[in-house]
Amino acid sequence: QPMRDVDFSGSTVVVTGGACGIGRAIAEAFAAAGARVAVLDVKHEETASLLEELPGEGHLCVTGNAGVEEDVRSFAEKVLECFGRVDVLVNNACITRRGILSGCSFEEFNEVLRVGVSAPYLLSLLFRDHFSRGASIVNIASTRASMSQKDTESYSAAKGALTSLTHALAMSLSPFGVRVNSISPGWIDTGVFGVLSPEDAFQHPSGRVGSPEDIVKAVFFLC
């Protein structure tokens, strides 16, 4: 449901990994609030269905791999061709290839970094001169950056790097009038992990796992 008293009419919002889970909830919420939404996601069917289901008109949903430079550059070009500027960039896309106990290879490890760290940097660079004054970049990091579990080296490293990238981008883009922040969710019930256990809930001070809507509210607050 649209959040009350929130209006992003006329804004261009870019969301990576926006066809499923947290990213989809963010894309749908911005569209419901009047924004024009541009989504990049590697999952073709989910990306196509999102375009049909988003409230409003004029959205852009592109199937592409955030870990492939050519796909990221092509997506950025399409965004600027369609909308001319960017008001909000949500870097949400990430993958995991497990870690050292699972024998995560050098290439698999770097694939995770390309999707979770290099793509946010490249999009920030490509949009640098096209952000509106007062634009916002929100990077979806994770508590895994500082509170990890075994066999999560690829994902944890990517989220830790994304947190550090956030600090640096905030300093570098401040003269452009661009704000840069990150959100570090804990367990979020997106359905991807099946039924989460009571132990997962007890990790959080609230005593429950989060919902995608919790992250949407945090993103809106930062934008």
Language model segments and positions:
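C-terminal helical subdomain
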Residues: 182, 203-223
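Active-site helix of classical SDR
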Residues: 124, 158, 166
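Active-site loop immediately N-terminal to the catalytic Tyr-X3-Lys motif
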Residues: 102, 134, 147-153, 175, ...
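Substrate-binding pocket helix/loop in short-chain dehydrogenase/reductase
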Residues: 100-101, 105-110, 193, 200-201
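Canonical Rossmann dinucleotide-binding motif of NAD(H)/NADP(H)-dependent dehydrogenases/reductases
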Residues: 5-37
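Alpha-helical segment proximal to the catalytic Tyr-Lys
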Residues: 129, 171-175
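Residue(s) in the substrate-gating loop at a strand-loop-helix junction
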Residues: 142
